[in-house]
A protein has these predicted regions:
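Glycine-rich anion-binding loops of enzyme active sites
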Residues: 1-34, 150
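Active-site glycine-rich loop that binds ribose-phosphate moieties when present
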Residues: 1-12, 41-58
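Glycine-/charge-enriched secondary-structure boundary and capping motifs
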Residues: 2-8, 61, 66-181
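Short clusters of hydrophobic/aromatic residues that line enzyme substrate/ligand-binding pockets
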Residues: 11, 28, 35, 46, ...
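Internal active-site segments that recognize and position negatively charged phosphoryl groups
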Residues: 18-26, 49-73, 77
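Short amphipathic alpha-helical leader/targeting segments
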Residues: 33-34, 40, 138
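Short, surface-exposed recognition loops or helix-turn segments adjacent to catalytic cores
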Residues: 34-35, 69
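Short, surface-exposed, charged loop/turn segments at secondary-structure junctions
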Residues: 37-42, 82-84
C-alpha cells in the first residue's frame, strides 16, 4: 500500500505510553486456523484478508501506536513494546475469537490467535479516555474493536510482553511467524 498523509500525522510503533490500552480489530487466529483446516469456513480470511486501511486512517488523532497483525499478535505487540520502550500485559481471555476457535481448548485457540499471523487486523494503543470515541468510530464501520491488555512501564533492561489467563501467567510456546529464518 502506498499513500500520502499529512505531515506529522503518521501513527508509528513507538508512540505508546504506560497506561495505554492495547486494542485489536476483528477476530484473531482465523487465517492460521484456515491454513491447517483448508475446508474451513474461515478459508476466505486466509485467501482474501481485508486490510483495515480505512479504520487505520480514522485512528489518526486517537491511537498512540499501531501496526497490522501479520506475524501474530504476540510478536507484533512485542514490536510496539520494544519501539516504545515499555512492557505489555496481554489478557488471553479477552482475545476476540471466531466461534469456531471458541470451541477449541483455550491453549490451542490462544496459539492460533497469538502466533498464527496473516490476520491483517490492527493492533493499536490508546489512552483509556479515547476508547468510547474509537468504539463509536468502529461501529460506524461495522467493525469490532476489543481491549486485550495494557502497556506498562518497563521493569527490566529488555522489554517484555506478559501473557495472562484469568490473571495467572500463561506460557506461550510460539510467539509468531518468522519470515526469514
Amino acid at each position: 500500500v502506498l499513500g500520502w498523509l499529512p505531515n506529522g500525522r503518521a501513527i508509528t510503533r513507538s508512540g505508546a505510553q504506560a497506561g495505554d490500552l492495547i486494542v485489536v480489530t476483528g477476530t484473531l487466529g482465523d487465517a492460521a486456523y484456515a491454513l491447517q483446516h483448508p475446508q474451513s469456513p474461515l478459508q476466505s480470511r486466509l485467501d482474501r484478508p481485508v486490510p483495515r486501511v480505512a479504520f487505520g486512517q480514522v485512528l489518526r488523532g486517537h491511537a498512540s501506536a499501531m501496526l497490522d497483525i501479520s506475524d501474530g499478535l504476540a510478536q507484533d505487540l512485542g514490536h510496539i513494546a520494544q519501539a516504545s520502550q515499555l512492557d505489555a500485559r496481554l489478557n488471553i481471555e479477552c482475545l476476540p475469537l471466531h466461534p469456531i476457535l471458541q470451541q477449541l481448548p483455550p491453549s490451542q485457540a490462544a496459539a492460533y490467535a497469538l502466533a498464527g499471523g496473516d490476520d491483517y487486523e490492527l493492533c493499536f494503543t490508546l489512552p483509556a479516555h479515547l476508547l468510547d470515541a474509537v468504539q463509536a468510530d468502529a461501529g460506524r464501520q461495522q467493525l469490532a474493536v476489543t481491549v486485550v491488555g495494557q502497556m506498562l512501564p518497563r521493569q527490566a533492561a529488555q522489554t517484555q510482553v506478559q501473557f495472562r489467563l484469568h490473571d495467572q501467567p500463561f506460557e506461550l510456546q510460539q510467539t509468531g511467524f518468522q519470515h526469514f529464518d
